[in-house]
Curated annotation (Swiss-Prot):
PROSITE patterns: WW_DOMAIN_2, ZF_ZZ_1, ZF_ZZ_2. This is Dystrophin, isoform E. Disruption phenotype: Flies exhibit muscle degeneration and lethality. Flies that have reduced expression of all isoforms (due to transgenic RNA interference targeting the common C-terminal region) exhibit severe muscle degeneration in larvae and adult flies. Muscles were either ruptured, absent or the fibers were detached from their attachment sites at tendon cells. These are necrotic, not apoptotic processes. Specifically required for survival and integrity of the larval musculature: the maintenance of appropriate synaptic retrograde communication and the stabilization of muscle cell architecture or physiology. May play a role in anchoring the cytoskeleton to the plasma membrane. The modification Phosphoserine is found at residue 761. It comes from Drosophila melanogaster. Component of the dystrophin associated protein complex (DAPC). Interacts with Dg, via the Dg WW domain binding sites. Zn(2+) 1 binds at residues 666, 669, 690, 693. Zn(2+) 2 binds at residues 681, 684, 703, 707. One of its GO terms (molecular function) is structural constituent of muscle. A zinc finger (ZZ-type) spans 661-717. Pfam families: EF-hand_2, EF-hand_3, ZZ. Residues 149-168, 182-191, 1012-1023 have a biased composition (Acidic residues). Its main location: membrane.
Length: 1051
């Protein structure tokens, strides 16, 4: 790479061919002398690559200075900093280059003098001209002393020897240059004065002519150079080519020289990027100004809403432009701090852009006020209650969320910005908004729905409508996530203010909503699902998943987006990422108390099922290898509607069926037309049911729950009618045993009893850890206490069914209690599961039985004591009537003994009541164990260890062809009512509408038992004793039966 002061090196005349670089150096050096007193680095093309000095440039006119570009005017300090490493290099190269330069310049002037003077000049004149040329050559040889003095002044600590050496070098340059000219031709001694004056004038005119020609050539080079050629200049140095790009330095000076060249390149690249950003920013601002000129006053509310949306989009664009402008201002400050000269046009453009951006911001604010006034005026004319009815006034600052509640309620926030609500009338505080409490209480009415999948879908649909999330498209939500910088931030945390900002940008796109109330309810719902501990922060992944699941969009598009959230750069997801996604999805039904019907809270079985469906071997899964799946594998698994996520496609079908009208009459409630789901029996001819009758499990005379049915969410076609008639005809010839032997399940069951180690908790940081279940004994105590309370108060839920405590809930509870070790000792097979449960349950039962036997022994001993006392207190003498005094004493003694006996009998009856309550618990527990054992027997009898386990989980079943079809929201499903899950939801707190999870403690069992109502005090003591003996015998028999069954199963 060469360092020149101009980008051209060719001269316009042959006389300038060998000195174009020198001419450029003279002109630029002259301009630097006028402006900042700086010099220029140059290297001649035909000479060595060492750094050479320039001779002093002649003075030029001020107009010539103004014609030069501004890049050629750096500060003196910048030039000194760049030239400082080359002092030693300059000293070594000075002696080798100065003589050649002076000799060429002398010959050049000699030729010019001969051509102009001609024959009229005498020998003396020629000699005088040569002497003049020698003098000029000496000046040229000793020129650049200005550069030397400047460098010597920068280094005041140099010794005097270096100064003397430089003087000697300068003197040798002058002598060598002068001697070079004298060797050509010696001047004659005698020359007339008039001729000498004429020759001097001629030579002066020639020199001035040459200087002018050189200046014109340099200026023509600048004028002919394009902006692209000139913008590469940095200060007084121009990067012309890459001569030194591959040069291998031979000494320290050359290495320092190349380092400076690299610094110049970096500065040049920064300047080019700076100019490029300015050009881009200028085009953005110009486009925004063009949009501003097209603004018109709104003529209607609809037009005002549309213009407000356009204004919001313009604001989003200008946000990016403002960020670019801030970067430019920071870069300009960096250049100034490092004494890098920024071109004047760039500074002017930057200042102009700052001014235009401020004017645009003011114009957008004024425009927003105009649109807000138009929306408010229309609202006043419509006579509304003061709430926002359109999004025309919602863009801008966030609304005051304190206005979302009305007296006597008050909204307050914690230190972590978590909202809570104060009821001044009852003097209570709640985490939930009053509207959310009413919503959750209203969901309790849906507990009458018999089947879990439809019950969960109905609840989610109610929440979706109340929060207006069904009016927000998934594309809008994704754009809002990206616009607020949430892309690729899924492992980080988001606080409540940021969530409110994102939700605000979503709700402003909806008309006729109470924006403040919707924001508060949405925040409340998200915190209930993902932050029940109210820490004030959730993961960004959870926030996105919670909104995408309930927003409007196609089902397959949601599946694809959810997979992209957890996929890596190779578009693959491993076990951990997949577990995080499924964990966040399962929290939605868990909040509604419906998680037991979908495989429980543990997501490991679902992950295992997905990997197996993708074709990954069981050995690879158990070996904790580095395995991952692609999008097609994930979609293929979801196409089968897995048990943990089956509620999501049911929700989509429910939303699609809301407006569907079927030209058929319900054979049970006689509704016509059927609105919503339509269920057609595939065994009974011309038998239809509406969704209400089907959900609540109603039945007709000839129709039974075991009959297969087909579900329609859209209007049927003639082809479907013919197909259903053919199916009904075929099913007429099939027996009941056939349907029991071939159950048709339309979802992919999750084998909870086969689960292995629990996956790691989805906790990205110590600040936010997911609550993990403690010892499962706590949940068992809660279950026992709730059942004992039901027995005590004599009431059970109206929505309970005989199968409400079936194997799904039990399997989930037992599997959660299994030790999750990392050494591979976790039970994987039904036999291991049974062995683990047997060891735990046997200890509990034996401990309870020992307590009961000990209490029974104490009661028997007390009973024998009472009997002996009663017998000993009776009179032994038959003639006791003869002694009246002794008779009276005996009667009084018997009366005291009777009172003691009554008191002890009362205590015994109370103890009997407690024993009976405990025995009821043991009997219930025994029935659960028997059901579990029966279930495990079925799993062992099957050849592949699964398949029929889904017959009791009960979600909509589907034909086999639907499993291979493309997932579709509006697909029809085959349903058998007897195969549907009838699990009851979790108990809801009637005070605040929450579904309780592990909200009780072990003391609740003791409290309920001590408050158990007792039987009548008139029962005699013998009945109490006999009942206790019978209860103990029943307990022993139950335990023996359980142990015997366990032994048989293990065999």
């Amino acid at each position: 790479m060469r360092l020149f002061a101009s980008s051209g090196q060719a001269a316009t005349s042959p006389a300038l061919a060998h000195s174009s670089s020198d001419e450029a150096g003279e002109v630029i050096e002259n301009s630097h002398t006028k402006r900042a007193g700086c010099s220029v680095l140059q290297s001649s093309g035909g000479k060595s690559r060492s750094l050479e000095r320039y001779s002093g440039a002649p003075k030029i006119h001020q107009q010539t200075l103004e014609m030069l570009p501004p890049y050629a005017t750096p500060t003196c300090s910048t030039r000194r900093r760049l030239l400082a490493p080359f002092r030693s290099l300059k000293r070594r190269s000075r002696s080798s280059s100065s003589s050649n330069e002076s000799h060429h310049f002398g010959n050049h002037l000699n030729n010019l003098v001969v051509v102009n003077v001609g024959a009229a000049a005498a020998n003396g004149g020629v000699a005088k001209a040569k002497a003049k040329a020698s003098s000029q050559s000496g000046d040229s040889g000793t020129g650049g002393t200005e550069l030397e003095h400047e460098m010597e002044q920068d280094d005041d600590e140099e010794d005097e020897e270096e100064g003397e050496e430089m003087d000697e070098l300068s003197l040798s340059y002058s002598q060598l240059s002068s001697s070079g000219c004298e060797e050509a031709e010696a001047p004659p001694e005698d020359v007339p004065d008039d001729r000498q004056a004429a020759v001097e004038a001629t030579v002066s005119a020639c020199v001035q002519h040459v200087a002018n020609e050189r200046r014109r050539n340099i200026l023509s080079l600048y004028s002919s150079s394009s902006e692209e050629q000139l913008h590469c200049r940095l200060g007084d140095i121009t990067l012309v080519d890459d001569t030194y790009s591959n040069y291998d330095p031979q000494n320290d000076a050359e290495r320092m020289f190349l380092q400076v060249v690299g610094i110049l390149r970096d500065e040049n690249e920064k300047m080019r990027q700076f100019q490029k950003i300015l050009e881009d920013l200028s085009s953005r601002v110009a486009l925004a100004e063009q949009t501003k000129t097209s603004w018109l006053p709104p003529s209607s509310v609809g037009e005002a809403n549309e213009q407000m949306q356009q204004l919001q989009r313009l604001r989003d664009k200008m946000t990016t432009a403002s960020a670019l402008l801030d970067d430019c201002n920071e870069q300009q400050s960096f250049f100034t701090a490092n004494q890098v000269l920024v071109p004047t046009p760039c500074l002017s453009k930057l200042e102009d852009l700052n001014t235009r951006m401020k004017l645009l911001q003011i114009a957008m604010d004024e425009r927003q006020k105009v649109l807000c006034q138009a929306g408010a005026q229309q609202t006043h004319e419509n006579g509304d209650d003061g709430r926002t009815t359109s999004n025309s006034g919602t863009i801008g600052p966030l609304p005051n969320l304190g206005q979302s509640v009305k007296p006597p309620w008050e909204r307050a926030t914690t230190a972590a910005n978590v909202p809570y609500y104060i009821d001044h009338e009852r003097e209570t505080t709640h985490w939930d908004h009053p509207e959310m409490i009413e919503l959750m209480k209203g969901l309790a009415d849906l507990n009458e729905i018999r089947f879990s999948a439809y019950r969960t879908a109905m609840k989610l649909r109610s929440v979706q409508k109340r929060l207006a999330l069904d009016r927000i498209s998934m594309s809008t939500a994704c754009e809002s996530f990206d616009r607020h910088g949430l892309r690729a931030q899924n492992d980080k945390l988001i606080d409540i203010p940021d969530m409110t900002t994102v939700l605000h940008s979503l709700y402003v796109t909806i008309d006729k909503i109470d924006l403040t109330l919707m924001l508060d309810l949405a925040i409340n719902w998200i915190l209930n699902v993902y932050d029940s501990q109210r820490t004030g922060q959730i993961r960004v992944l959870s926030f996105k998943v919670g909104l995408v699941l309930l927003c409007k969009g196609h089902l397959e598009e949601k599946y694809r987006y959810l997979f992209r959230l957890v996929a890596d750069t190779d578009r693959r997801a491993d076990q951990r990422r997949l577990g995080l996604l499924l964990h966040d999805c399962i929290q939605v039904p868990r909040q509604l108390g419906e998680v037991a019907a979908f495989g429980g809270s543990n997501i490991e079985p679902s992950v295992r099922s997905c990997l197996e469906q993708a074709g990954i071997s069981q050995e690879a899964i158990d070996g904790n290898q580095d395995i991952s799946i692609e999008l097609q594998h994930f979609l293929g698994w979801l196409q089968h509607e897995p048990q943990s996520l089956v509620w999501l496609p049911v929700l989509h079908r429910l939303a699609a069926a809301e407006a569907a009208k079927h030209q058929a009459k319900c054979n049970i409630c006689k509704e016509y037309p059927i609105v919503g789901f339509r269920y057609r029996c595939l065994k009974c001819f011309n038998f239809d049911m509406c969704q209400k009758c089907f959900f609540f499990g109603r039945n007709a005379k000839n129709h039974k729950l075991t009959h297969p049915m087909h579900e329609y969410c859209t209007t049927t076609t003639s082809t479907e009618d013919v197909r259903d008639f053919t199916r009904a005809l075929k099913n007429k010839f099939k027996s009941r045993k056939y349907f029991k032997k071939h159950p048709r399940v339309g979802y992919l069951p999750v084998q909870s009893v086969l689960e292995g180690d629990a996956l790691e908790s989805p906790a990205p940081s110590p600040q936010h850890t997911t609550h993990q279940l403690q010892n499962d004994m706590h949940s068992r105590l809660e279950m026992y206490a709730s059942r004992l309370a039901q027995v005590e108060y004599g009431g059970t839920g109206s929505n309970s069914t005989p199968d409400s405590d079936d194997e799904h809930q039990l399997i989930a509870q037992y599997c959660q209690a299994l030790p999750g070790t990392s050494n591979g000792s976790a039970p994987k097979s039904p036999v291991q599961v049974m062995a683990a449960m047997d060891a735990e349950q046997r200890e509990e039962l034996e401990a309870i039985i020992r307590d009961l036997e000990e209490e029974n022994a104490n009661l028997q001993a007390e009973y024998q004591q009472l009997c002996s006392k009663e017998q000993s207190g009776m009179p032994e003498d038959s003639n006791g009537m003869q002694h009246s005094s002794s008779s009276m004493t005996g009667l009084s003694g018997q009366g005291e003994q009777g009172q003691d006996m009554m008191a002890e009998a009362k205590l015994l009856r109370q103890h009997k009541g407690r024993l009976e309550a405990r025995m009821q618990i043991l009997e219930d527990h025994n029935r659960q164990l028997e059901a579990q054992l029966q279930r495990l027997r079925q799993l062992l009898d099957e050849p592949n260890g699964g398949g029929s386990s889904a017959t009791s989980s009960g979600l909509p079943s589907a034909p086999g062809s639907a499993l291979n079809s493309k997932p579709n929201t509006l697909q029809t499903r085959s349903v058998t009512a007897s195969q549907l899950n009838t699990d009851s939801p979790a108990k809801m707190n009637q005070q605040n509408g929450h579904y309780e999870h592990n909200s009780k403690n072990s003391s609740g069992l003791v409290t309920v038992i001590t408050e158990q109502e007792l039987e009548s005090i008139n029962d005699d003591l013998e009945d109490s004793s006999s009942s206790n003996t019978t209860n103990t015998t029943t307990t022993t028999t139950t335990t023996a039966t359980t142990e015997k069954t366990c032994v048989e199963l293990q065999k």
